[in-house]
A protein has these predicted regions:
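Sec-dependent signal peptide recognition
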Residues: 1-8
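Aromatic- and Gly/Pro-enriched helix-to-coil junctions and flexible linker segments
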Residues: 11-115
Length: 115
C-alpha cells in the first residue's frame, strides 16, 4: 500500500517538484540541513522549507528564484564571498550546477525535508 501511495504521489508531482525531490533535496539534506534547520537556524536561515530560504537571513535571502547569480546560497557554496558553506571545501561543481539550475527555474519545492 505504501508503494502505491508513493507511486501516485510521484504521478501528481510537477516536474519541478520531482527535480527538487530527486536532485536538490539530497544536496540540501546532506550539506546544509544538519546546521540550518527549524531547530538550529545558524545564520538565521533554515533549509527545511522554501519560505525560510526566501526571507531575509543574516546575509539577505538565501535564494532569489529565477536569479541564481543574485542568490546568496550559490556564493556561499562556491566559497566566493565572506561566508563559505559548508565548512571545508566548496561543493562539487556538479552539485553547484544543480542548485543553479533549480534556482534559475524558480526554486520550486517538493516534499518536506527531514534530517
Amino acid at each position: 500500500m505504501h508503494a502505491t501511495y508513493l507511486a501516485l504521489l510521484a504521478l501528481c508531482q510537477t516536474p519541478e517538484a520531482r527535480f527538487f525531490d530527486q536532485r536538490i533535496a539530497p544536496i540540501l539534506t546532506k550539506r546544509c540541513l544538519g546546521c540550518h534547520n527549524y531547530e538550529l537556524s545558524d545564520g538565521g536561515i533554515a533549509f527545511d522549507n522554501r519560505d525560510s530560504l526566501l526571507k531575509k537571513g543574516l546575509h539577505g535571502p538565501a535564494i532569489t528564484p529565477g536569479k541564481p547569480e543574485q542568490s546568496y546560497l550559490l556564493e556561499a557554496v562556491r566559497h566566493k564571498g565572506d561566508v563559505k558553506m559548508p565548512p571545508g571545501l566548496p561543493l562539487p561543481s556538479k552539485e553547484i550546477k544543480l542548485l543553479r539550475k533549480w534556482i534559475l527555474n524558480g526554486a520550486q519545492w517538493g516534499s518536506k525535508l527531514r534530517n
